[in-house]
Amino acid sequence: MHGLTGSGIVMADSQTKAGLRRVAVAIGLMMLIAGRPAAQAPGLGSSAELIDPKTFRVCADPRNLPFSDEAGEGFENKLAELFARKLGEPTNYTYLPQVVGFVRNTLNALRCDVIMGVAVGDDLVQTTNPYYHTTYALVFKPNTGLDGIESLEDPRLKGKHIGVVAGTPPATVLVQQGLMALARPYALTVDTRVEAPTQEMANDIAAGQIDAGVLWGPIAGYYARRVSPQLVVAPLLKEPERMDFRIAMGVRRSDQDWKRRLNRLIAESQPEIDGILAEYGVPLLDEQGHLTPPP
């Protein structure tokens, strides 16, 4: 099972088993936090619903753009606002860096009722239906001879200095292709209040310190627009290793009715969800894994 780290990046299987998180995948993208699998109040059975009936309570990272921040500028913030508005409720946030212990100290401690941006299949929370599907992408400066690349197996990458986040699926492929000797690793799990390794990678590409980088799709699309020159984002659609993941919301295992309610919200709101994601440059895939045009 793959998972999302604290910076929203989907990470490799061995890291998931180690109990690391995220990632709004995650995206990082199944949340990798050590914690109990479900939260229950004393004396309540496993069927008890523990949802605040009047407030859409979200747990998120305080400084993890493009996913979330305390100013509400991330796309997960915007999606939470959308869902809360449709429920006729205000939003309330509990912010905590998404590192080891995040689920235990937030959702399972009853400090919120939903975590945005969890990879489908996360075994630490119950996931809703997915509300978007995306993939890792290669990011590079324009006019560098890398246009049209869809796989890290492309021979044009031989001899290139490529940035990669340690412990993620692309790192495995770089090793398999003999590209790690010249690669530059960036940290996987960090305190986002003081470090921003994925933003650093985008800056390094723009400055010519590395030739290209592999980033989780939402991060690639966001930071590619925020450097000069703007970078090309090439989704990796033809990899031997899995690079694409479906992203959902995470809730407590006991909250079955709440999950069904959120599933209905997702189904009713999909065009609006896609519009918000497009504003942030998130590359979106259809059910067959094909890139979809922006709405």
What is each of the regions a protein language model found here?
Residues 24-34:
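Bacterial N-terminal signal peptides
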Residues 40-43, 169-190, 232, 264-295:
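Ligand-binding clefts/hinges and TM-proximal coupling segments of bilobed small-molecule sensing domains
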Residues 41-123, 192-195, 279-280:
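Extracytoplasmic small-molecule ligand-binding "clamshell" domains
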Residues 57, 62-66, 70-85, 138-197, ...:
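Bilobed "Venus flytrap"/periplasmic-binding protein-like clamshell domains
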Residues 58, 83, 106-108, 155, ...:
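Hydrophobic residues within well-ordered alpha-helices
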Residues 61-62, 133-145, 225-266, 282-295:
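Periplasmic-binding protein-like
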Residues 81, 85-86, 90-156, 167, ...:
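Acidic, polar ligand-binding/catalytic clefts
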Residues 89-90, 108-117, 160-161, 200-201, ...:
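Alpha-to-beta junction loops
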